[in-house]
UniProtKB/Swiss-Prot annotation:
Main location: membrane
Residues glycosylated per entry: 37
Subunit description: Alpha-beta TR is a heterodimer composed of an alpha and beta chain; disulfide-linked. The alpha-beta TR is associated with the transmembrane signaling CD3 coreceptor proteins to form the TR-CD3 (TcR or TCR). The assembly of alpha-beta TR heterodimers with CD3 occurs in the endoplasmic reticulum where a single alpha-beta TR heterodimer associates with one CD3D-CD3E heterodimer, one CD3G-CD3E heterodimer and one CD247 homodimer forming a stable octameric structure. CD3D-CD3E and CD3G-CD3E heterodimers preferentially associate with TR alpha and TR beta chains, respectively.
Organism (species): Homo sapiens (Human)
GO cellular component, one term: plasma membrane
Pfam families: V-set
Record-annotated Ig-like domain positions: 22-114
Alphabetical GO biological process terms: adaptive immune response; cell surface receptor signaling pathway
Name listed for the protein in its UniProt record: T cell receptor beta variable 19
SUPFAM superfamilies: Immunoglobulin
Record flagged with keyword Glycosyltransferase: no
Amino acid sequence: MSNQVLCCVVLCLLGANTVDGGITQSPKYLFRKEGQNVTLSCEQNLNHDAMYWYRQDPGQGLRLIYYSQIVNDFQKGDIAEGYSVSREKKESFPLTVTSAQKNPTAFYLCASSI
């Protein structure tokens, strides 16, 4: 491999890791005991007004749990039962999975938009 090509590959890979803004969801993995409430964190530094929480069960598509267009206001999505949210800051939209939620395996996704 020539030095020019190697240099380009290294610079491209370094550039791919540079991010000015983003959305962070935590924890990455979570195991919950039956009857236990747990809270998933969602933080964004993109200055987006709208934030969303989705759930995906194995073999299914994404389903909207809750969404928020502005601070201190949020609406239920298609499957809000067994969940609660708050939106005290523009940057944050935590989701609490309550003990009423029975299905043990799911993928949760937080998103934001302008």
